[in-house]
Amino acid sequence: MLEMSKRQSPRGAGLAPTIAWRVFQLLTLAGVLWVGWRLLGRVPYRIDIDVYRMGGRAWLDGRPLYADGAIFHTQGGLDLPFTYPPLAAIAFAPFAWLSLPLASSAITATTLVLLIVATTIVLTRLDVWPHTTVTSEPAWMRRAWLAAAMVAPAVIYLEPIRSNFEFGQINVVLMTLVIADCVPRRTPWPRGLLLGLAIALKLTPAVFLLYFLLRRDIHTLLRTAATAVVASLAGFALAWSDSVEYWTETVRNTDRIGTATLNTNQNIAGALARLGLGESPRFILWVLACFAVLALTVWAARRALRGDTADQTTEAPVLALVCVALFGLVVSPVSWSHHWVWMLPVLVVTAVLAYRRRSVWFTALTAAGLALTVWTPITLLPEHRETTASLWRQLAGGSYVWWAFAVIVVIGLVSSSRTHTGDAHETDEPLVPLARGEAG
């Protein structure tokens, strides 16, 4: 019933499919409500939300966020630094006026909604289930129901999504800003504004500038960079001392974010650190590996963007964005497993293409990705004793990285190498006319 291709459902659908759809909606609603109760019914302590609130409170009180080794004493008993740019502390300030349970509930509920929104946007760009006679609901609503049905179990069973909620992280918020800006065919705002804001809130989304560069969309790339700069300057205007400290000192100190050897640090840097290599050879190997993965990503994304059939034109931008997202995760100095919330949209993409193309490769990627996130092998690495683990445990414990490599390679191999007949970004313009800042 839930057709995952662009073919129209048979006309004259009987009563049974309609009833099945209503049952599906009821089950999905029940699943989302159950997940909501799990997350909000008895609000657990979420340590990162605690730090966010204290960062916002420090800014409101005029206390330093970073200077003199500023540390925040969490209710969980750990002393942690504030690792985001000053603009993020300003954004978190309203939550400082709320109690910790209320702030936790607000951020958690927002995260759940945005996860459904992000998944809906991906399904829409992939043109999933565009026509049907089963229901009169518009396509976007059908896709939202499908997205909710995917998100509900993901929150409980997929390790990156589950841990994101357990810590109270904002990775889903950042991911949604990126997806909403990059994936739709058109946006009601000049494309690049949301990505620029995401970069100003946390530096890691800057990797998606590569996406617009690969699309040769220089106008949007420059608009994104300008937005990030303007937003960061707003941080200087509102928190001058903290901004100077962050951009001149703190931003270079990645050690304050956490120990690279921890098993949940799923990236190249973590894999090398766990081998026990010295700092100099490890840095050289990391740089070489990053350039190699960059070359692989550029190759795969460009092949995806050169597709010239109707299906590939629909899929190409999403495939390219997936490559860039995975590249950013594996080359970042720190990529905790809860940063890998991109696993959900990537799995949605591989599952849709596995069905649509009857692809063994995408089917294998989907199955492997689900297995790795549901039965995570990260725990094969003994926590805080990762460098003593055997080689096979180290390889298995870094499985997110190897899966990401496999996804990028498969996208490059299966994508058409034929040249697109039109401009790379002509179908992805925002609705805003040129006079108001048309995105190129």
Swiss-Prot record:
It is an enzyme of class 2 (transferase). Its EC number is 2.4.1.-. It is found in: Cell membrane. Signal peptide: none annotated. One of its GO terms (cellular component) is plasma membrane. It is a multi-pass membrane protein. Responsible for the addition of alpha-(1-2) mannose branches to the linear mannan core on the biosynthetic pathway to mature Lipoarabinomannan (LAM). This is Polyprenol-phosphate-mannose-dependent alpha-(1-2)-phosphatidylinositol mannoside mannosyltransferase. It comes from Mycolicibacterium smegmatis (strain ATCC 700084 / mc(2)155) (Mycobacterium smegmatis). The lineage of its organism: Bacteria, Bacillati, Actinomycetota, Actinomycetes, Mycobacteriales.
